[in-house]
């Protein structure tokens, strides 16, 4: 079932939570973000291929290598984000999108608007982070 969104549509708390319109809105948002990240990754690859790695000056070469390492770390971060976006798109397809993995409660439109790949409510995320911090401190 394809839902056509009105131009400028934003999900409203007055609507049924995770209605077909909500799901289509977030699906489109995630797909656009995914496309943007993939384009950035392509740009990084192109840039690295075009770079002159035979820079005669050792300082210039060191700068190039540092910049390349930073670009590759960013690309790796993008790859991980694309995986999370793909997971979110799968949750939209199976009907579990928008609900907390831990509690089953609604994550909330404002949180999903800010972080459409969120899998936990704010409270569950805070609890998770506290537990992680305790494990690191032990």
Where are these regions (language model features)?
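Short Cys/His-rich "knuckle" micro-motifs
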Residues: 110-114
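Amphipathic alpha-helical recognition patches that constitute DNA-binding helices
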Residues: 25, 102, 116
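Short functional micro-motifs and their immediate structural scaffolds
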Residues: 107-108, 129
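Short cysteine-rich clusters marking metal-coordination/redox-active sites
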Residues: 100-103, 121
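Cys/His-coordinated zinc-binding microdomains
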Residues: 30, 104, 125
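Interaction interfaces in information-processing and related assembly proteins
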Residues: 1-94, 131-132, 137-138
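Cysteine-rich micro-motifs
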Residues: 118-125
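Residues immediately within or flanking Cys/His clusters that coordinate Zn2+
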Residues: 79, 97, 118
């Amino acid at each position: 079932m394809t839902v056509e969104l009105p131009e400028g549509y934003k999900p409203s708390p007055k609507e049924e939570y995770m209605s077909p319109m909500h799901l289509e809105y977030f699906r489109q948002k995630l797909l656009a973000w995914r496309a943007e990240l993939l384009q950035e990754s392509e740009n990084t690859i192109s840039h690295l291929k075009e770079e002159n790695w035979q820079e005669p000056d050792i300082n210039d070469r060191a700068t190039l290598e540092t910049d390349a390492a930073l670009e590759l770390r960013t690309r790796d971060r993008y790859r991980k984000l694309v995986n999370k976006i793909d997971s979110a798109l799968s949750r939209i397809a199976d009907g579990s999108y928008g609900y907390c993995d831990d509690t089953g409660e609604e994550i909330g439109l404002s949180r999903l608007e800010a972080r459409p790949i969120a899998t936990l409510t704010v409270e569950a995320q805070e609890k998770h982070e506290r537990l992680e911090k305790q494990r690191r401190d032990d």
